[in-house]
Curated annotation (Swiss-Prot):
Disulfide bonds: none annotated. This is Putative pre-16S rRNA nuclease. Keywords: Cytoplasm, Hydrolase, Nuclease, Ribosome biogenesis. Its EC number is 3.1.-.-. Could be a nuclease involved in processing of the 5'-end of pre-16S rRNA. The keyword Manganese does not apply. CDD domains: YqgF. It is found in: Cytoplasm. Belongs to the YqgF nuclease family. InterPro entries: RNaseH-like_sf, YqgF, YqgF/RNaseH-like_dom, YqgF/RNaseH-like_dom_sf.
Length: 154
């Protein structure tokens, strides 16, 4: 079930179970995981794959392994808030994932997170190739951190 309102998403979550976040791109997906208390977001890994069936199978494995209770997907919208082609691609992916899992899926505005993640890694002297391999997972953790911080206020 896809949910666009955090106030509706939060009550559906099982206590003491982590969330997973996805930064969905055309060539790779960044994955982040919260701790069970849902107060820390950590980059987990990057899936470099364009076949959606393989991507969903990989995500199902991660969801099962970590006993995840909900999914956050970064929703790319342009700076004015308008829907873009990439927004529609991510929405379609979210719909496909929703058919495969019985967990709530929350769509979180992800404007500028990949750029911020890349700048963050650059500030630590991470080389360009390594930044490009890890920026999506770091972006996913930033998306998840935004959600975790917002949930604390509910």
């Amino acid at each position: 079930m896809i949910i666009k309102n955090l106030q509706e998403f939060y009550p559906l979550l099982i206590p003491n179970a982590p969330l997973i976040a996805i930064d969905y791109g055309s060539k790779k997906l960044g994955i982040a995981l919260s701790n069970q208390e849902r107060n820390i977001a950590m980059p987990l890994n990057t899936i470099i794959e364009i076949n959606k069936k393989i991507v969903i199978t990989s995500l199902l494995s991660i969801i099962e392994k970590y006993k995840v209770c909900g999914v956050v997907i970064g929703l790319p919208i342009d700076m004015s808030g308008a829907v873009t082609e990439q927004t529609n691609i991510v929405m379609k992916f979210a719909e496909e994932l929703a058919k495969s899992i019985n967990l709530p899926i929350y769509l979180q505005d992800e404007r500028l997170t990949t750029k911020a993640a890349n700048n963050f890694l650059k500030s630590f002297g991470v080389k360009r190739k390594d930044r490009n391999n890890n920026d999506d997972a770091v972006a996913a953790s930033m998306i998840l951190e935004t959600v975790l911080d917002s949930m604390k206020k509910l």
